[in-house]
Amino acid sequence: MSIVCLESLTFGLGHLVRAADALGERLTLLTRDRSYYTYELDRLPADALDVVETETFDVDGLTALLERSPRPRGLISSTDTWTLVAAELAERLGLPGLDPAVLRLTRDKSAVRRRLYEAGLTRGRAVPVTGAGPETAEAILKEPGLPAVLKDTAGTGSQNVWLVRDPAELDAVLAEAAGREFRGRLFAEPYFAGPVYSAETLGWDGRTRLLGVSSRLMSPEPYFREEITAFPVAFPEPRRAALERWLGDVLAAVGYTDRFAHVEFVLTADGPEVVEINPRIGGALVGEGLCRALGVNVYEALVEAALGRRPALMDAEPPGGPAVAFVLGYPAAPGVFTGVAGLERLAGLPGSPAWYPVRAPGDLVEHLADSRGYAGIVYAEGDTAELATHHAVAAANALRVLTEPAGPTSAPGPVPVLGPAPDPAPAPGAAGEGGGGGADGG
């Protein structure tokens, strides 16, 4: 093994294998369950990489495994869940890697907000939420005020995020949150209104390069469920350059100045505001879109960075390719996923649309207000991101995600791919924020 990948995103493993091969390296995937990567593994030769099933949260066990000969030359981690495990593992093995303290900071959303506020890069502060009573509600009404977002400091996959627009919603959300388990702690911050985007950046030695910006079309309030993504957004050059400078300042403020970053932000009437900083390449089909739209295998930069080398992509001018877009396919009712109707129609539609499955028949779909609920992704291309979006939406509209009741009280149904998320809980505003595919945040 020369390059080790500690788990991976649902999509992109094939690109990573080909990137390692192009650079003369052999990829080994460490995973708790190889079946999670069935889609990608089925499309690779059997000997394309080594797959080792092991407990990937056990740092001691992983260290012992990787200290055996031959030792790896680099370690890749592209998921939120294993970010800190990978950082500790790289440190133990003496491999090129990022400062674990920086990665811990990026995984704490309230700490990121505080750091950006201190640097003058956000107008809002993070306020801890320590209870559910009237005194807590009163404190939130004072700061950050309404509308506000309440969320988990270490949340992922769009879970445990609430939009609060009035005092009644605040009381309901505090009551609901009191019964939830959090990966971190609950905090409040201002709700920044405006279109949502994600910046796909690559950094090295303090310089940040903006590879492009993805649009994020969201479900109606109070939900934060992602519906459609397109890349690259066609910003006028002065605005693109200003965004690149701002992103460089944002990432420098948290000390994350090397490797890929996926920065979600809102373009408010008063300028950009960070939603969250992800120290990795984007999930879902963002990596696929980068490869196709830029005309290069961006995963070579992942391998080069893991080896401690300046990625060639920092200085290259990619040849370019088609713009891309994808639609997340959600059921409108929970239940057992049974398949997708209409896939045979995709071949006759413009934009070379394709269905990328995330769930297998028999999987239970329980949560529809965040990214846990989608069954797959409809991908399409176009001459511009706008045209690619039209193609992807037309293809998604030709499909029906099929579910059947999981129990006697469940609603059956063929259901539309698109549409607002139903309210899954008594409290208004229960929602996810951000999202991604597979392990994007998983």
Regions found by a protein language model. Name each.
Residues 49-57, 126-132, 164:
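Short acidic-hydrophobic, aromatic-tinged amphipathic segments that line or gate anion-handling sites
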Residues 129, 161-166, 202-204, 268:
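Short beta-strand-to-turn element immediately C-terminal to the catalytic PLP-Schiff-base lysine
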Residues 303-442:
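Peripheral (often C-terminal) accessory segments that flank ATP-dependent C-N-forming ligase machineries
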Residues 122-124, 147-150, 161-198, 213-214, ...:
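Conserved ATP-binding module of the ATP-grasp superfamily
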Residues 91-160:
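A conserved helix-loop-beta module that forms one wall/lid of the active-site cleft
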Residues 65-72, 143-144, 180-181, 254:
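Glycine-rich phosphate-binding loop signature in dinucleotide/nucleotide-binding domains
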Residues 190-256, 260, 267, 274, ...:
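ATP-dependent carboxylate/phosphate-activation module, predominantly the ATP-grasp catalytic core
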